[in-house]
Amino acid sequence: MQKRKNKGRFGDEASQRQLRVSELIKRNIAKILIDSNFYDQDRKIYSASVTEVRCSADLKIATVYVLPLDNIDAQDLTAFLGKNKNAIRYALGKEVSLKYLPDLRFKEDTHFLNK
């Protein structure tokens, strides 16, 4: 019987630990974005859907893939989330207990746009 490999949608293999930490971060960042009100200087509300989180092999970097909601420009959203990543990371640190909290990087999820 062949052992099943954990492949992400980009083809590279991820360990079970990476998958568990990615799902934990995904659920908690989505909760943070729902519970918190993130505004820019013009009081524009940014809402996003977290579609996937990919952790590096050493779990020090987490790439968060987001889709904008409410007709928001995706580049504006990722720039805004990148600018506020320390506040999001701080809130994430209160929710999860990991030895090292990964650095967050936000990217637009284009996987659904290509289909």
Placement of each model-derived feature along the sequence:
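Charge-rich, low-complexity N-terminal segments
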Residues: M1-I61, L67-K115
